[in-house]
Amino acid sequence: MQLKALEVREITDYIKKMMDNDIILRNVRVKGEISNLKYHSTGIYFTLKDEIASLKCVMFNEYGKLLNFTLQDGMSVIVTGRISVYERNGTYQLYAQSIQSDGIGALYFAFNKLKEKLQKEGLFDSDKKKPIPKHPKKIAVVTSPTGAVIRDIITISRRRNPTVDILVVPVLVQGSSAADEICNAFRILNKREDIDVIILARGGGSLEEIWPFNEEKVARCIYASRIPVVSAVGHETDFTISDFVADLRAPTPSAAAEIVVPDIKVYQRELFLLKTKLLTLMTAELNRKKKEFEGLKRALYLNSPTKKSEILRHKVENLTASLYNEMLSIYQHKRNDFLILAEKLNSLSPLKVLTRGYTIVLDKQEKVISSVRDIKPYDEIKILFKDGKAKAIVQEVKENE
């Protein structure tokens, strides 16, 4: 009996039904290493392999969106799903419904691979880090809206500086949708003009739980942000890709608030010191200007007509006084000379002998008669005494023998 010839689609359909109805193949867990990874609009396509065999796999978007980490070539994973036939090319493949990392090692592998890639691109370069503003007015906190993280940040911020405005941007911080929500928050914030700094925060957790902060898309959103970003993910010992890309890494969310929010007491102290310094500078400048003003005032006064007139008046007064003193000195000197000469003249005067009892005889012409030969009898003469004069007539003239 000759076998009936089946068409390709018939045998393929038969094999597919056998696989779909197989109780084992309908729900399998397969462990292997990812290779030939490709992201497509319809889902994620990759090959799962070990040392001997390989298995094509596909994870459609309805399941792919539930992934809480990014797949990487070389990553060891455990894929859960069903084995079926892809009729178009007649190959069987694993239709994945969930993917788990095969231990922490797989996630560390993906972490280090992405870290190396981004580092080569320069996303971690220190010279590209933006400075964190010293006195921010408004801080955006991208984190879960509930839990200890946001409470601690708000409490510390209000304690340090109640004037700083805190804007909470709620996002998922774990799970497959977390990375997209974080990136969307960054896009929204970067359209605003009132945000001074962004804090990206979440509490501690396992590597799987904090994996969204190791996603490449999150790293690139942080790097592209024009607003400075502080990464505060997990505990002090936790490091994420976000920490390396951010402008500043804080060891904890609470530490981020301590770093970003300025202490108002320090600000008040700085303000007091600045006020004191300003007052000192103003006082010094005022004194300098006052001295300058006094100098200009004096110069103006010295060059004014009134001052010049006053100076000339003082000069005239000084010259007058000097001339008076000089004339007085000359007068005194001449008077003394006159008195001395008068005394000398007086001592030599013929009239001086009258005080000693002598007399002076004058003729009619008031000439002194010094000899009897100058007179004759009956001449009229005048006799001068110290206290008066007398007239007489000569009775007799006789010469000495």
From Swiss-Prot:
It comes from Thermoanaerobacter sp. (strain X514). InterPro entries: Exonuc_VII_L (IPR003753), Exonuc_VII_lsu_C (IPR020579), NA-bd_OB-fold (IPR012340), OB-fold_nuc-bd_dom (IPR025824). Heterooligomer composed of large and small subunits. This is Exodeoxyribonuclease 7 large subunit. Its EC number is 3.1.11.6. Pfam families: Exonuc_VII_L, tRNA_anti_2. GO terms for cellular component: cytoplasm; exodeoxyribonuclease VII complex. Its main location: cytoplasm.
